[in-house]
């Protein structure tokens, strides 16, 4: 019997969760979609009208980069990198979301509209993306926490 099949032996490593199934697969897929959406949006905004809201557009590009790294980290089961990236993501959503509502001028936003021309991925806590940017890092951290309790790496 191989070590990966022997789950009864005390002290034996727990079997790793399959990366291609279950909640992990859905989480990676949602992160991938958000990575593409955020990166595409920010590239367009930077090329088309960077002068209108440079801070907001750089924040959108940063969000896109964070989603790309989180997608790769979750897919490759790089738990520590995923934990760091998703924690930064949550902090970014909370800080940018709050600033976009309380002090939009600090971000270079001209309106509170989360669907506006100069809004970021994280404006109004991601309301322009149906609040997925607010919920996703919480789900990601819970997923990683659950994995660590069972000695799972991803």
Could you describe each region identified by the protein language model?
Residues 2-34:
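Cytosolic juxtamembrane helix and N-cap/initiation of the first transmembrane helix
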Residues 72-99:
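Loop-to-transmembrane helix junctions at the membrane interface
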């Amino acid at each position: 019997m191989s070590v990966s099949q022997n789950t009864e032996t005390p002290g034996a490593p727990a079997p790793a969760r399959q990366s291609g199934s279950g909640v992990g697969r859905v989480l990676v897929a949602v992160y991938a979609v958000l990575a593409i959406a955020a990166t595409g949006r920010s590239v367009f905004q930077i090329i088309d009208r960077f002068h209108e809201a440079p801070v907001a557009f750089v924040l959108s590009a940063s969000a896109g980069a964070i989603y790309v790294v989180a997608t790769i980290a979750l897919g490759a089961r790089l738990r520590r990198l995923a934990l760091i990236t998703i924690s930064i993501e949550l902090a970014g959503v909370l800080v940018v979301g709050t600033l976009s509502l309380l002090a939009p001028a600090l971000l270079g936003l001209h309106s509170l509209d989360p669907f506006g021309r100069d809004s970021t991925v994280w404006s109004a806590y991601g309301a322009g993306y149906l609040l997925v940017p607010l919920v996703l890092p919480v789900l990601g951290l819970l997923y990683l926490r659950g994995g660590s309790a069972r000695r799972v790496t991803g």
